[in-house]
Amino acid sequence: MQIHTAYDVMKEFLITDADLGGKYGIPKIPKTFIHPGKDTVDFAESFSRKIKNHRELDVNFYVDDVQFQRLWNQPDKYMEHLKCFHAVIMPDFSISVGKNGMPLAMCLWNKYRNHALAHYMILNDIPVIPNVSILPEYCWDWCFDGLQEGSTVACCTNGRVKSKAARLEFCVGFKEMERRLKPLRVIIVGRIPEELETDTEIINFKTRNQKINEEGVNGNND
């Protein structure tokens, strides 16, 4: 493929042989029928020596961007590490929209980076579960780009369940995702909004913070 910058500072090697789609040329991620592992751990937690059952776990990126920026900076350094796990949920660099959100260009850049890294993982024989950003209607013309119908997909509800308005917005976006992608199943990491109604198979995992909070409560009861 053609590299457009000296020393490939834009990391175009990540999208070698990628099929680009949508108005903004987002790398397409193939659908997968993979069933998730027994649990999921975030990228930072995946390095813990306490983890012994790597092959039963999926790695997610539902944490602050700073905790996995190093993957973007030096992707080759972490490919062998990620191969130790059952599968990897596509990276999730922040996409913040709305009145106080990011400029659209930043959202699109992070959307691109998520897909570029996922494509590179696939090139390195790592099973990847597509990650879907559930966003408001004015983002629907780009937020589903690069994702295929009929796949297992994943999403996270961090910051989406605190208020009823946020929960309802998530549910509306989820329904549109179902309409467009017709997912085989959806992995939801985090609390499921009580307002969500769906016939799609849902597999729910807790975030690291949920687990820590529950362990704290249980510890206080001892």
Over which residues does each language-model region extend?
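Non-catalytic, usually N-terminal nucleic-acid engagement modules in DNA/RNA processing proteins
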Residues: 4-81, 221
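Eukaryote-skewed repeat-based solenoidal scaffolds used as protein-protein interaction platforms
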Residues: 48-54, 58-59, 63, 71-217
